[in-house]
C-alpha cells in the first residue's frame, strides 16, 4: 500500500484478499458486469494509483481505434469537491494534456436516481429481515468550506441549524 502512513498501511493490508485490494477486485467485477451490458469497451481508472486515467484512455484507444466519444462514470453517487469534482477535473486535464482525439463527457452524480436507490434498498433488505439491535450508517464527511462553496443558492447551506430540513436545490451539493 504505497504512500500511506504505517498505521493506515497496516489497516489496508488487513482487508486485502488473495485477489488483492477489495476496491480493485470489486471495481473489476463491476467493469465485467457493465461490459456485458454495452457494446463499447469498458475500462476502469483510478484518480490516485493504478490503473491510471491515462492508461485507461490509452487502452480504450487500442481497443477501439478511431474512438470518438468517451463517457466517464465517476463512482461517487454524490457530488463533493473532494471526490467527484477532483476526479472529473483530473480526467479532463489528462484528456487535454494527452491530446486524445475523442470527446469526453461525465455522468452526473446519481445519489437520487431511482435505480441507485432501489439497489441500496435491495442490498439492505435481507438484513432487515433479521433480528438486530441497531443499524449503523457510515458516511464520509465533507469539509464545511466545500459545502459553503458548492451552495448554488449562496444562502442556504450551513446558514442555520435547520438548513437540511428545508428542501433546496443546494442539497445536490452537500
What are these regions (language model features)?
Residues 1-174:
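Active-site-proximal alpha-helix that buttresses catalytic centers in soluble enzyme cores
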Amino acid at each position: 500500500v504505497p504512500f500511506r502512513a504505517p498505521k493506515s498501511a497496516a489497516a489496508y493490508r488487513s482487508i486485502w484478499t488473495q485477489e488483492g485490494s477489495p476496491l480493485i477486485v470489486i471495481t473489476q467485477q463491476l467493469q465485467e458486469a457493465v461490459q456485458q451490458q454495452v457494446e463499447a469497451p469498458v475500462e476502469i481508472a483510478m484518480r490516485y494509483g493504478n490503473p491510471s486515467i491515462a492508461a485507461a484512455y490509452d487502452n480504450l484507444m487500442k481497443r477501439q481505434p478511431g474512438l470518438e466519444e468517451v463517457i466517464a462514470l465517476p463512482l461517487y453517487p454524490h457530488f463533493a469537491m473532494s471526490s467527484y469534482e477532483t476526479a472529473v477535473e483530473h480526467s479532463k486535464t489528462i484528456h487535454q494534456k494527452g491530446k486524445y482525439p475523442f470527446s469526453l463527457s461525465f455522468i452526473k452524480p446519481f445519489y437520487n436516481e431511482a435505480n441507485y436507490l432501489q439497489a441500496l434498498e435491495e442490498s439492505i433488505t435481507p438484513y432487515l429481515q433479521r433480528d438486530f439491535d441497531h443499524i449503523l450508517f457510515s458516511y464520509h464527511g465533507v469539509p464545511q468550506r466545500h459545502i459553503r462553496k458548492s451552495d448554488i443558492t449562496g444562502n442556504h447551506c450551513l446558514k442555520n441549524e435547520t438548513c437540511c430540513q428545508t428542501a433546496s436545490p443546494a442539497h445536490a451539493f452537500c
